[in-house]
Amino acid sequence: MTLAMQTTEWSKMHWYEKWFDANYLKLYRHRNVSDAKKQVKLIIDTLRPKKDASILDLCCGAGRHCMLLHEMGYEISGLDLSELLVAVAKEEHPDLNLFVGDMRSIPGRYDIILSLFTSFGYFETDEENERVIESVGASLNNGGWYWLDFLNPDHLRKTLVPETVTDLSETCRVIEKRQIVNRTVVKDIRFVGDDCNEHYEERVRLYTREDLEAMFSKHGILPKDAFGDYDGAPWRPDSERTILYGRKE
């Protein structure tokens, strides 16, 4: 394949097919483990799953949450579209049951499905994003739980930081620019320097709590309640997060 052909194929890829690669790991490798621990504790305290409950971390990434749940003795599986992230997670945690897949088509059935750290809203249309909820509803056992940790659009609009700069090394800097365009938060990500020169984009479609609850209900998941942060504060219109959970009836 020529360089021109490779460039054309790259340009045809969706942002989420490009971005979750080695550079993603470099930038986000040391994400706040404290937040992950808080959310896992909140999940366990709220849903109180049995130790033999089958749990799926949808869009598990490099396995942060899977590892924590596994260490607590739970039967956890993880699915992610990125072959690289799944491979890295398996190398670091060989005991975990992780596999590559698309969140719009979930194989198997589970007692609990988790969508953590804004792993929703990746697709351009509402119909495609709703397919994720539809797939979750079809893959939950009766009485099973769905836990969705998402942005709160109202809070985001008030607090959006237009630009941040991160120095990965003396020769590589990452510039991230953010804006909201047509109900989608768009992040332009550039790696610039002597030993890095890459450009990515991240796009997340914004949904209110009411939007999410409507999709839950449409696909057989009864919304129960929502938290506003990882400490378990009750959800408010100005909360930082919308952490919604519901049960398949």
Enumerate the language-model features and the residues they cover.
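Conserved class I S-adenosyl-L-methionine
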Residues: 2-50
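Short conserved AdoMet
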Residues: 48-50, 107, 124, 141
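Class I SAM-dependent methyltransferase SAM/SAH-binding core
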Residues: 56, 63-105
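A short acidic, Gly/Pro-enriched loop at the edge of an enzyme's catalytic core
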Residues: 104-113
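A short SAM/SAH-binding and catalytic strip from SAM-dependent methyltransferases
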Residues: 112-127
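A short glycine-rich, Lys/Arg-flanked "PGG" loop and its adjoining helix->strand segment in the class I
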Residues: 130-142
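SAM-dependent methyltransferase
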Residues: 147-215
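C-terminal lobe and adjacent flexible extensions of AdoMet/dcAdoMet transferase-like proteins
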Residues: 211-249
